[in-house]
From Swiss-Prot:
Record gene name: Cdh11
Location(s) in or outside the cell: Cell membrane
Keyword Transferase belongs to the record: no
Gene3D superfamilies to which the protein is assigned, alphabetical: Cadherins, TCF3-CBD (Catenin binding domain)
Residues in the Extracellular compartment per record: 54-617
Membrane topology listed for this record: Single-pass type I membrane protein
Tissue: Selectively expressed in osteoblastic cell lines, precursor cell lines of osteoblasts, and primary osteoblastic cells from calvaria, as well as in lung, testis, and brain tissues at low levels.
Described purpose of this protein according to its UniProt entry: Cadherins are calcium-dependent cell adhesion proteins. They preferentially interact with themselves in a homophilic manner in connecting cells; cadherins may thus contribute to the sorting of heterogeneous cell types. Required for proper focal adhesion assembly. Involved in the regulation of cell migration.
Glycosylation (residues): N455, N540
Protein name: Cadherin-11
GO molecular function: calcium ion binding
Residue intervals on the Cytoplasmic side: 641-796
Gene Ontology CC: cytoplasm; glutamatergic synapse; plasma membrane; Schaffer collateral - CA1 synapse; synapse
Amino acid sequence: MKENYCLQAALVCLSMLYHSQAFALERRSHLHPSFHGHHEKGKEGQVLQRSKRGWVWNQFFVIEEYTGPDPVLVGRLHSDIDSGDGNIKYILSGEGAGTIFVIDDKSGNIHATKTLDREERAQYTLMAQAVDRDTNRPLEPPSEFIVKVQDINDNPPEFLHEIYHANVPERSNVGTSVIQVTASDADDPTYGNSAKLVYSILEGQPYFSVEAQTGIIRTALPNMDREAKEEYHVVIQAKDMGGHMGGLSGTTKVTITLTDVNDNPPKFPQSVYQMSVSEAAVPGEEVGRVKAKDPDIGENGLVTYNIVDGDGIELFEITTDYETQDGVVKLKKPVDFETKRAYSLKIEAANVHIDPKFISNGPFKDTVTVKISVEDADEPPMFLAPSYIHEVQENAAAGTVVGRVHAKDPDAANSPIRYSIDRHTDLDRFFTINPEDGFIKTTKPLDREETAWLNISVFAAEIHNRHQETKVPVAIRVLDVNDNAPKFAAPYEGFICESDHPKALSNQPIVTVSADDQDDTANGPRFIFSLPPEIMHNPNFTVRDNRDNTAGVYARRGGFSRQKQDFYLLPIVISDGGIPPMSSTNTLTIKVCGCDVNGALLSCNAEAYILNAGLSTGALIAILACIVILLVIVVLFVTLRRQKKEPLIVFEEEDVRENIITYDDEGGGEEDTEAFDIATLQNPDGINGFIPRKDIKPEYQYMPRPGLRPAPNSVDVDDFINTRIQEADNDPTAPPYDSIQIYGYEGRGSVAGSLSSLESATTDSDLDYDYLQNWGPRFKKLADLYGSKDTFDDDS
């Protein structure tokens, strides 16, 4: 705005200056004799004439862009033969005569009727002639003169480009030339400073600078790194009037890239491509190809394609085929012929790599327009929603309407639609659908606790073309009703300590219980805990509802004893918050246990009373395990010995040795000299090295219950061994063996002593072995060998 005011003021000043000069010129033409044909009057009005006849005029000037209301007076033509009687007629011809410049044929005044622009035309050449008005006879020969258009500063500087793109190698030295921007001013460079330009940088410091006179942009910082910042935006200003105040200015933007460039940008061979795609095409299908040619090779010839604009930018995409350097246009989303039948894309091809040796070839990219038409196709039905969600109450009767799906044919034919359920998604056939209107109904009552959501798929197909089919997911939520009573959240069990005092454990907390309900939260909490009405005043225990879906069980009294009752069953009623509420009775088992002085549980089994005072549960388990292992070993060994077959031994006299061997095992060989000593079973307390102390009174003593004390361990072992011996003696099928089975524990009062060797039968020893006859068939061989001769003879 300030520059416009300055321009208007300058125009007014120049106009006034011109009129004063024209007036002065006209006066000089009358006063100075240097102008030919000029009349001059003296003070008394006498006309003085020069000796030489001719034109009295000068070179004329007119200011450009004059916008006054009256035509501009350019100058005046006058001949010295003009006496002022009107007989002379002035004629003007030449450039602009009669259109731009007009002359008063009587006075010779020349006016400019149009606004002149020096930038369009700087001067006009005209021809003047004086003729007789009546006869048109030339009175003087034609004379040529020039009208010059005087310049004013009415044109700002203009750059050759609105936006410049330049590249410079990264890490260049300070002062490295980047690019030169050039501006031109249409004003007269020979007149004043209207066309004298000075360049300056408005944006881009401190990275770049510009030479004020040449417009060369240079780097101002060293070691600029492309990896840190690749692109810079610089604004350059060019100002006329030598950069002084009042001058006009113009700006340009320079984008400087710290990267390599190549010398050939890609170019499309044509400006428009025509393509087509069917509305039945699926996303990813190729629509067409475009190709921008780049004469460079290698990495400098690689081209990438992008869709930069267009109404189909969301429906189509373009990829680069690096083998052929083609831009492949593909379908990104389905198109609909009935919605829109044509799309337009603006595709840009750009180089991947830029060569730093060629920085003045401009931007390395090109654009092309691609027009894509959509072809009609028979489309399947289209559901009004991409998915459906319906709700139904659980336990609803068969035939209850769940909801509806709706589809229509998008084609102009608008074919009727038939609906069906994908039975792969409804294997239990919970639902059925009306094929004509799409209403979904139940076929049986549903249970939310089994399945809260049911997901099925519904098909919609054209009645005349079953292949045109569409599927939509339908989610059915089963709404909850209060059909499940709450119950214990876990199998709870309570414990209470024995006590002698009846009030010792009064109000003692025993256990905290919580509940769980399979129904939804709306029909679940808050749970209410209570005792059944019939035992509301239970003398032993009470239930206190904590009002947080838990309840505490407390003892009403003390004096619990395992001898009297070792456990109690407490029924607890739990009600939920549903409408109507449901309840269930749950039984809590409370065991009476032995505790130490601190209340810690020691044992909750009533059988603990029958155990010895100093024997722990771990010791009992160890003893029982040892007994079982020994019994298994004995049974296995006896079984193996019974199955063993040995040849009949023939004793020779020289084989008898004079020694007696004592066998402590059941084995019959000399190598079996070790036996299992089960004497420790006579004292179970000594198994683990623990002997009860008699000098200290135990803190807890178990009182044995009459009639439940087990028999001593020794009796059990005796019975077992004697039973096995009787079975062996009475087995008629058992073959005879030459070895005797010796048991490590033979019972009380065994009359059998040590056996001598076989040689003792032939010695003169007074040993009597007649008792072998009483040992049964297994010892018959020994009885025959060692018996007395009389006995032998009697048997024989």
